[in-house]
UniProtKB/Swiss-Prot annotation:
Stated role: Probable oxidase that might be involved in lipid metabolism.
Coiled-coil segments: none
Cofactor: Fe cation; Mn(2+)
Gene Ontology MF, one: oxidoreductase activity
Cofactor remark from the record: Binds 1 Fe cation per subunit. Binds 1 manganese ion per subunit. The iron and manganese ions form a dinuclear manganese-iron cluster.
EC numbers, comma separated: 1.-.-.-
Protein name: R2-like ligand binding oxidase
UniProt lineage: Bacteria, Bacillati, Actinomycetota, Actinomycetes, Mycobacteriales
Organism: Mycobacterium sp. (strain JLS)
């Protein structure tokens, strides 16, 4: 691509009130360093768990770190799609997004090292066929497609896959599980801080995905059907991952019930439809400064806090 101008030099400068740059500024303001998290108490807490509990938690952590690594590797075509569309603000935000995914990979690996889980953990994913289909097939295929087809429809498919199903259902459900483990048992303070920090980052990631789908739906109503179809394809796969995880254990640790996590994941997925649908027929200029995607993620976080405070 030949460069002909610099958008940062345009009259009026950059629109700092636009959603992507609002998220970019928020990420800068909330910067954190994994090395600052104290994992020193987590080793003793980890060893106080039963073998069954450690096995379950290791599988949960393996899914997280492998997922963070996958997105670190797969997200680049979305940046190129933003460049092809001439959206500097989105491109700036996605550079931060990619950095944060790499940082999340780092911090989960640091935690595993701190609690002594240094063996090969790949086996913890071998018995999770839905997880492997999502991360080994659906995610890379939908993002790599943007390298040759950066169209709005392809962007909506990619965002629905990652931001709405993987982050917006699977990851949120996993964070909820970590909160239940840590808060109910009053253990693993380092993991609690790790999840709090990552959750804050990923609320911005999900908000960007919602914003991206909303602006494409506002521009062309046909993209609503693209979003709806992709979500309906993948939601059953996301819920199946919960089935796969619970099916591996005759005895379920931590007092967990499969139905609780299925309901949690389904609720988060279904509520995303309304936020995207509300953009239909809207003016693009309105969508660009509409912060409802971020407000939705903050609402989810506040709801979780209330539930966990009740169970503590």
């Amino acid at each position: 691509m030949t460069r002909t101008r610099s958008d940062s030099l345009a009259a009026g400068g950059l629109n700092w009130d636009s959603m992507p740059l609002k998220l970019f500024a928020g990420g800068n303001a909330k910067f954190w360093d994994p090395a600052d998290i104290d994992f020193s108490k987590d080793r003793a807490d980890w060893e106080s768990l039963s073998n069954l509990e450690r096995d379950w938690a290791t599988r949960l952590c393996a899914q997280f770190i492998a997922g963070e690594e996958a997105v670190t590797q797969d997200i680049q075509p979305f940046m190129a799609a933003m460049r092809a569309e001439g959206r500097l603000g989105d491109e700036m935000y996605l550079t931060q997004f990619a950095f944060e995914e790499a940082k999340h990979t780092q911090v989960f690996r640091m935690w595993l090292d701190a609690v002594g889980m240094t063996d090969d953990l790949q086996c913890y994913l071998d018995d999770l066929p839905s997880y492997r289909q999502m991360f080994y097939e659906e995610l890379p295929a939908s993002l790599e497609a943007l390298a040759t087809d950066p169209s709005p429809a392809a962007q909506v498919r990619a965002s629905a896959t990652y931001n709405h199903v993987i982050e917006g259902m699977m990851a949120l459900t996993g964070y909820y599980a970590w909160h239940r483990i840590c808060v109910d048992r009053k253990v693993l303070p380092g993991m609690q801080e790790l999840v709090r920090r990552i959750g804050d980052d990923e609320r911005r990631h999900m908000a960007w995905g919602t914003f991206t789908c909303r602006r494409h739906v506002a521009a062309d109503d046909a993209n609503w059907e693209v979003f709806e179809n992709r979500m309906n394809e993948l939601i059953p796969l996301a819920l199946s991952n919960t089935d796969d995880s619970f099916a591996l254990y005759d005895e379920i640790p931590f007092g967990f019930a499969k139905e609780e996590f299925q309901q949690y994941a389904a609720d988060k997925g279904m509520r995303r439809f309304g936020t995207i649908s509300s953009a239909r027929g809207r003016a693009l200029a309105e969508i660009d400064v509409d912060y409802s995607p971020l407000q939705l993620e903050d609402t989810f976080a506040a709801e979780d806090s209330r539930v966990l405070a009740t169970s503590a």
